[in-house]
Amino acid sequence: MNTEPEAKTNEYLRGIVANLPEKPGVYQYLNTEGTIIYVGKAKNLKKRVYSYFSKEHEPGKTRVLVSKIADIRYIVVNTEEDALLLENNLIKKYKPRYNVLLKDDKTYPSICVQNEYFPRIFRTRKIIKNGSSYYGPYSHLPSMYAVLDLIKHLYPLRTCNLNLSPENIRAGKFKVCLEYHIKKCAGPCVGLQSHEDYLKNIDEIKEILKGNTQDISRMLVEKMQELANEMKFEEAQKIKEKYLLIENYRSKSEVVSSVLHNIDVFSIEEDDSNSAFVNYLHITNGAINQAFTFEYKKKLNESKEELLTLGIIEMRERYKSHSREIIVPFELDLELNNVVFTVPQRGDKKKLLDLSILNVKQYKADRLKQAEKLNPEQRSMRLLKEIQNELHLDKPPLQIECFDNSNIQGSDAVAACVVFKKAKPSKKDYRKYNIKTVVGPDDYASMKEVVRRRYQRAIEENSPLPDLIITDGGKGQMEVVREVIEDELHLNIPIAGLAKDNKHRTSELLFGFPAQTIGIKQQSSLFRLLTQIQDEVHRFAITFHRDKRSKRQVASALDSIKGIGEKTKTALLKEFKSVKRIKEASLEEIAKVIGEVKAQTVKKGLSNE
């Protein structure tokens, strides 16, 4: 049985899981002391983390791990491969207790261009700072082998471990090997390939490894055309295959880029409740190894520039960062010793800034969801403020009233009014109206009658008036409501309209005279609220209309039977619920309710219907 603290922790964790994004990323589990005890990657963060808490685990590591979780952090990335690389970096950095299978410091391989007179190129898992160049790491090994194979086919490179110094080559210490005879090596060991020619190939290879393949591709196209002009189609086809390999090759990752080292990245987002969120990423040796988002509560209406400056100072102090470059989203009036501030517009640094912005926006959205779950009224007020801003109202529309008509060719004409208070339906305030003064199908006249009756009475009884009236219809409905509200009753109540598309779905919000379309995203919470209001008034009106029509039909069927009074009708409808069921019932079943004589009368009367 869970203790009270455990129950609170479980509720807190469920809240985090419920708001996780369905995006690739890395998640971190922390214990009660704030220590990271597990790091994992996911193609879909929400599904992966949810799986830990949605079932009973068998006794063992996973069950123990779940029991130790007190908090969850996560970092959003753009691809599953990025998540793999980031997971690897974080596991090596924090060495979490429950990542036992990944604690051997095994890392993803990189491609090394060795710092030698005639450089060798090979894959390695060790980064040695001896002037060599490293590209990667590669989490997808087939991609790495494809690149190495491409290089092998494009350029004849040495693969031996010989010390090919100028002195040793001049001394004639070496002989060509099999690689030379099968044309996989040009024989630099015996002076058959010059140092300059070899390094020219190395420079081109480095461009391929960096992903800068445009010049290489252009060179291959020219070579391919040359061979084709010389009628050497077989060789041209081989060059074409190499060209296609290069074009399809993508060697860089957004999360890990070997050209970036010791850089801090910051971004900031604000909300409407005096909060600001700052995201911090730290890049070391081409990889993200720190990621953190935190919240500031404004006290003196500080600007984004002031808050971001505070965040930079605090994070660099907390994580002991000595980065010489800081990437930020906008210019800052901040000077730090030996530090350059960069506002990137393109390239790898811009991708890192975009990744930071992605994380801070996601964090902001998650905090908003959590706050609104704990305090639903906060969500309601946010939506009402959105309506206020979109329609330029003087105040949030705390009380919204919406009208709709319902009839079939003018028969059984009714109308309905639903009331939403603080963005929630207030069903005790709903009202139904039988149309009294309109003959035939006239929606505009019916709307005028109902609006007039409702607000004349509100004025007479000194009842609260709505902050916004919404009509279930377009410009015509809005205009007839305006005529009653402004011209007849001399009231000042904003009027909006909800128009539907040809599939009878809410499509747009109209406001103003003449009416203008207010652009609202159909996936937004505000649009869903407006759709809810329109669906609710339609449901309420049509249900009332059906009930009225049904009662009229029932009344006419039983009223036409002589000798059957109100008491008998009530007894029959109470038992059988409808005229149709009375018709289907046997004589004996009806007789049990009203006696045999009346039962025969009813049976005979309904059979003539």
UniProtKB/Swiss-Prot annotation:
Q: What is its main location?
A: cytoplasm
Q: Does the keyword Metal-binding apply?
A: no
- Which InterPro entries does the protein's record reference? GIY-YIG_endonuc, GIY-YIG_endonuc_sf, GIY-YIG_UvrC_Cho, RuvA_2-like, UVR_dom_sf, UvrABC_protein_C, UvrC, UvrC_RNase_H_dom
Record-linked PROSITE patterns: GIY_YIG (PS50164), UVRC (PS50165)
Q: Its GO biological process terms?
A: DNA damage response; nucleotide-excision repair; SOS response
Sorted alphabetically, which HAMAP family does this protein's record hold?
UvrC
Function comment: The UvrABC repair system catalyzes the recognition and processing of DNA lesions. UvrC both incises the 5' and 3' sides of the lesion. The N-terminal half is responsible for the 3' incision and the C-terminal half is responsible for the 5' incision.
PANTHER family to which the protein is assigned, alphabetical? UVRABC SYSTEM PROTEIN C, UVRC/OXIDOREDUCTASE
Q: Name it.
A: UvrABC system protein C
Tell me what organism the protein belongs to.
Answer: Bacteroides thetaiotaomicron (strain ATCC 29148 / DSM 2079 / JCM 5827 / CCUG 10774 / NCTC 10582 / VPI-5482 / E50)
Query: What are the leading ranks of the lineage?
Result: Bacteria, Pseudomonadati, Bacteroidota, Bacteroidia, Bacteroidales
